[in-house]
Amino acid sequence: MLRGQAREEDSVVLIDMASPEAGNGCSYGSTAQASEAGKQQVAPSRVGSSAKPPIDFVLVWEEDLRNQENPTKDKTDTHEVWRETFLENLCLAGLKIDQHDVQDEAAAVHYILLRAPWAVLCYYAEDLRLKLPLQELPNQASNWSATLLEWLGIPNILLEHVPDTPPEYYSCQFKASKLQWFLGSDNQDTFFTSTKRHQILFEILAKTPYGHEKKGLFGIDQLLAEGVFSAAFPLHDGPFSAVPESSQVLGLIQRQVLFQHWARWGKWNKYQPLDHVRRYFGEKVALYFAWLGFYTGWLLPAAVVGTVVFLVGCFLVFSDIPTQELCHSSDSFDMCPLCSDCSFWLLSSACTLAQAGRLFDHGGTVFFSLFMALWAVLLLEYWKRKNATLAYRWDCSDYEDIEERPRPQFAATAPMTALNPITGEDEPYFPEKNRVRRMLAGSVVLLMMVAVVIMCLVSVILYRAVMAIIVSRSDNAFLSAWASRIASLTGSVVNLVFILILSKVYVLLAQVLTRWEMHRTQTEFEDAFTLKVFIFQFVNFYASPVYIAFFKGRFVGYPGNYHTLFGIRNEECPAGGCLSELAQELLVIMVGKQIINNVQEVLVPKLKGCWQKFSRGKKAGTGTHPAPWEADYELLPCEGLFHEYLEMVLQFGFVTIFVAACPLAPLFALLNNWVEIRLDARKFVCEYRRPVAERAQDIGIWFHILTGLTHLAVISNAFLLAFSSDFLPRVYYSWTHAPDLHGFLNFTLARAPPTFTSAHNRTCRYRAFRDDDGHYSPTYWTLLAIRLAFVIVFEHVVFSIGRVLDLLVPDIPESVEIKVKREYYLAKQALAENEALLGATGVKDDQPPSSEPSLGLPA
């Protein structure tokens, strides 16, 4: 049943927790008042009591005191009204508010410290369907490699004891009326963890209005976008570096544990303390690092096998008969010009290029392609099991189906409500047909951006052709001989520049389009945004490698009848084949992108941090030790996980889709990821403000993208081996002519047609299976049939084996299934109500828990 949403007055608040005593907590003062830093001392955020809860959230805004009369004063006054209204509504929602100001002659920085009383926490914990513990269990986290090494009796250098290991719990959705059943409910100070408190505070901040909601005047995100507040963040629980004396007496706090045992470079060879990461940063961040560590571990066998295959290629360079024939051919093969203004050339001059091509094009690449296809299938199958185990252990297995609430931005702007069939509650609703129309409109924009990428690719192709002509005319013999490779290498660099520029533009455009599409939940919003950006980035990053792998050298023509693009002759593959050029392109894009990203991740946060400290140095106060909120404000805002996931998924594509051309790709990916894990860990622990802990039950649509890339990789490698490699022509020649491949080089070269020979008064050869008139020879058609048959057999074999592995490996481990049933039984026994089993019956208590004496509040 659909209903139009009633128009609400501006003064409506989420929950009226006001009381005669609330005024004390709401006296946050005027923005004109300021106190010197260091005069007001407040306990650190991790210290709290029932009398004064810990600091749960901090809001910050800056005020310029130099130009009170300026053209932007009207805007400043509007911001002041919005800010005061917002803070008043927070106060009415039950939050306790303190204000601390730091100023100098020029500017003031205002800090709003938010605390949530016990009653507010209980009310919103039930409203958000948060899961809280019923019974503690010993932490049974295990790692398959640790188990294997222990069984073999081999010392495990990856294992390290991390103090204060979080226990596991049986848990269920919180009900205030059944408070006594929950573990630790007798201690109001510790019952809600810091991450749970942050989630509740952020929900309140996201929904609180500061004007008319239908006009979009609600929520902290909009206030940050408008510049009303400059920051909103929960506090870290203390400094990340521990003082030796205090750590021995008091022990390490959670942030210090993560720094000492996870974020330090010296821990590159240790298991990640994922349970500690989850406890401090939430499930979404922990799942990212779990996936990154899992993927990196699986890269190790792929890197070893790929390195062995490459070394085999190095050995074959000096023993391969066709390569030796080419290098020792002297002036036996006079080759046709490679461009309209180029001269004839000797095939023996391309000896180095042919040897380089042999490094990547040999029989071992067929085995490696098959190995990597099955590797990718097994990687995803075992990740599903790992994900299911973590999702259960972290109480988020059914988060998306039952727990996840509509996005605040969606709830405020949706035109009607509808009954949720799972929870039985009325929720904001946006008609699906309207959303589909908007998504189709967004798809048109995506296609336009893809067209821009293709235009850039064509420009790079033309650049390479023109550059090859210019360099080939050089008087320098080295430059003339390497003209095509120099043009290809510089073209790869130009292509990388185009890629990085277009990426920045489209990400901003995709954010606008996805907000316009009105997705109900944050998960749906992120999935839609991710898919848009990935499709664009896929074309952006892979267009050039796809061109080299499957199109370059296919539409060249023959001497006397060459095909052109915009009047410029189409490119040919070099003497070593296009596979070596594809390997070069992959290494330039993949390794170049990794180096640029890692340099950015190291330098940019440092530079931003130094700039923030410099720009706010005069506002930091005169005290030796700044207050916790001042110290955290100097940190960088957390930018989320999207770019981290995108970087890894694009890398996964390079490792799998074109692995037949570059067996060293897994090795470079492994080395990068060892650095990436610690870089990302240091950013979250040391350089970022603490993000709001977000729940998630998996890595979202990224898993489906990885599955699609795995299927695409099988097809791509099959076509690479069949059409871009010399593997099948060599096999065919060894079967039909000479098993030792003597004469294979001459077999692959055609003679120029008589018309071309008479016009130039000189005969020449070119790479093709054509007769003397330029028509395809019977050998070409025979090889074409063999190639197509190879593609069909290869992909059927790999997909069949993958399907069998999918059936043999259960998605959820049996031990997890047993634990889920056990937890279901305990929840039923503890709550003894059918609504606890279903999450909710559809009718919520009319009164907030402030009316319940069991919550410890005055009646």
From Swiss-Prot:
Extracellular side: 319-362, 463-492, 552-651, 722-780
Family matches, as InterPro entries: Anoct_dimer, Anoctamin, Anoctamin_TM
Top-rank lineage group of the source organism: Eukaryota
Segments passing through the bilayer: 298-318, 363-383, 442-462, 493-513, 531-551, 652-672, 701-721, 781-801
Broad class of where this protein is predominantly found: membrane
GO MF entries: intracellularly calcium-gated chloride channel activity; phospholipid scramblase activity; protein dimerization activity
Entry keyword annotation includes Glycoprotein: yes
Disulphide bridges, residue numbers: none
GO cellular component, one term: nucleus
Species per Swiss-Prot/TrEMBL record: Mus musculus (Mouse)
GO biological process: calcium activated galactosylceramide scrambling; calcium activated phosphatidylcholine scrambling; calcium activated phosphatidylserine scrambling; chloride transport; establishment of localization in cell
Gene responsible for this protein: Ano7
Family (UniProt): Belongs to the anoctamin family.
Name of protein: Anoctamin-7
